[in-house]
C-alpha cells in the first residue's frame, strides 16, 4: 500500500483511495456545494480566495497538521494576505481591506478552520486583542503600531481577562492598577487561560483600581517584553498546538499612552467586545461542524461494509442527514445575524446605539450557546460514524473531536450564556 500521508511515525490506517478523497481540496468542494446557493458571487469569490491560499500554503509548506507542527510560524504568511481578521477595514493603518465586516470574517474563519482548526482558534484569540485597539487607538502611534503588527500577522496578540479566582465573574477582578504621579499605572495580579499569551508580543489586559469593584476597571495595552510581565504556558491536552498562558504581573508599569480605557471605562470596553467575541466563537463552532461533516460524508460514501456503502445503512445515513440539517440551519442563522450586524454598523457609522447593542449581545449569546453545543454533538457523532478512521491521526477528525470539547467553555461557559439570556428575558418582560 502506497503511503500518501505522513503525519507521524505511526501507521497509515485509512486506505489510499479514501485518504486521497478526504483531501482539503475535496472537503472544500463539498462545503462549497452546500453554501454556494446562499452566497452572493462576491462573497463566494472571497471564500474561494481564502481557500486557494490555504491549499497553496498546505502544499508548498508540506503541512501535515501533525501535533508537533508550530502553527504560530504560519501567522505572518496569512497576515500578509489579510487573513487574520476581516471584521474591519483597517483604514487607520492603511490596509483598506475589501471586503470586510462580519460576513467576510465568517467566511474567512470557515475556510481557515477547515484548513486547521487549532490554527483558526489561535487566530481568533489575536482578533480579540485587535478589536479593542481598533475601537480605542485614538490615533496614538504606539497603539496603531500594535494594531498593525497583529492585523498583518507580524505578531500574535492575546486578551487577559480571566484570573485564577475569577473565571465567569469577570467584573470583580483582583488584578490591581495603581496610578502613578506621571500618569502611568503599576499592575499587580495574575491572569490565566489566556490563549496565545506565551507567544504574544501584545496583550490587552484588564485591571481594577479597587479589587472586586467592576466600576473601577481599566483597560491597558501591554508590551510583553516589559519588566514585570511573567508568563508560563498552561497546557490544554485537547488543543496541544495552541499555547495558553498563566501570567504573573509584578509592578508592571504601563505608560500613559498605552491606557486604552481609563479607570471607570474598563467595564464598558469589556462589554462592547462581547458581540464580536461570541459571534466569532459561534462561527468557529459551526465551522468545526462543517469540517467534521465533510470528513464523515465523504467517508460514508466510500467505506463499504456488508457489500454496500455505509451511507445506505439507516443508522449511518439518517444520523448524518440529521447533523447536516442542524448545521445548515444554524449556518443560515449566523449568516443572517452577520448580515444584519454589518447593515447596522454601516447605518450607525460603526457605533451601535446602546439598546441595539444590548439586544445583539443576547442574540450573540444564543448563537454561542447553540453552536458550541452542536459542535460537541456533530464532531463526536461524525467521528463515531467513521469508526477507527475518525479517531486515528490520519485525518483532522481527531482535532475536531478534541477542540469541540472545549468550545462551550471558551469565551464564557454554557451556564453564563444561559444566565445572560435569562436576564434578556427579564428585560423583554419589563418592556411590555
Annotated model-derived regions:
Residues 184, 188-230:
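A short core secondary-structure module
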Residues 31-35, 59, 63-72, 94-96, ...:
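Glycine-rich cofactor-pocket loops
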Residues 152-162:
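A short, Trp-centered hydrophobic/proline-enriched beta-strand micro-motif
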